[in-house]
């Protein structure tokens, strides 16, 4: 009895232990694996055993294709939501075509306004300059008559019959006089317009004054008397030069002899006589001058040199 109880108790404990072990294994199977280790496919608790139909935890992933769970496609579609669309970021805000065109139109309008202001400023400056010059011309017009007006007045004074009609000529003379008067008035108008357009003439040289009020002396005019005096002075100078440095020429006989002109250079007492050759401009002694003319070595070279009292062409 005791042995039975012992065996039964012992066997019961064994059965109870086996029951407890079975219950613990079931509970261990029911507990999900929540370890921090990496798993293939990004899924936790994926057992291919008898508990494959139990709900499992799904790890989030950036790509939906990475998660592969055993089961039907409907369960996967219900378990994994569709990924949100990715938005591309940019540093500058995107602008539409209308804003771009509006900005370009504003820039073109600003450029046109600036250009218009520059043109208005330039025209105002030009008008001010033209107004000042016209007033200056009007002020100087009665002081300086034009050359055309002077010529017209001289012609009218020389031909009085052209401006006055002949007496007793009848209607033809009157028509001629009226037409001549109209032509003269038109010419006067044209002359006044030309006078306005021409710059004012320069003041006369005799009345030249400096800014300090000092009258500047002008050079004398070249008159006929001054020219004659100048010619006489040059003639006197040439005459004095001929007296100081007379013209000479060589007189050499022989086949190699030739005539060479020169002039006796001015010298003082005690200095050597020197002759300037006209053909080369060299300063030569009398012996060298005769040798230059082809005379060779002579004992008295001054006998072969002739003094010309008349002026030479070279002076």
UniProtKB/Swiss-Prot annotation:
Region (Disordered): 1-28, 68-142, 156-237
Bias (Low complexity) ranges: 184-197, 221-234
Location of the protein in the cell: Nucleus
GO cellular component, one term: nucleus
Residues forming coiled coils: none
The keyword Lyase appears for this protein: no
Keywords attached to this entry: Nucleus
Pfam families registered for this protein in UniProt: EAR (PF07897), NLS_NINJA_AFP (PF16136), TDBD (PF16135)
Biological process terms in GO annotation: negative regulation of DNA-templated transcription; signal transduction
Composition skew (Polar residues), residue ranges: 156-166
Biased composition (Basic and acidic residues): 99-108
Keyword Nucleus on entry: yes
Family, similarity comment: Belongs to the Ninja family.
Database matches in PANTHER family: AFP HOMOLOG 2 (PTHR31413), NINJA-FAMILY PROTEIN AFP3 (PTHR31413:SF31)
This protein's name: Ninja-family protein 1
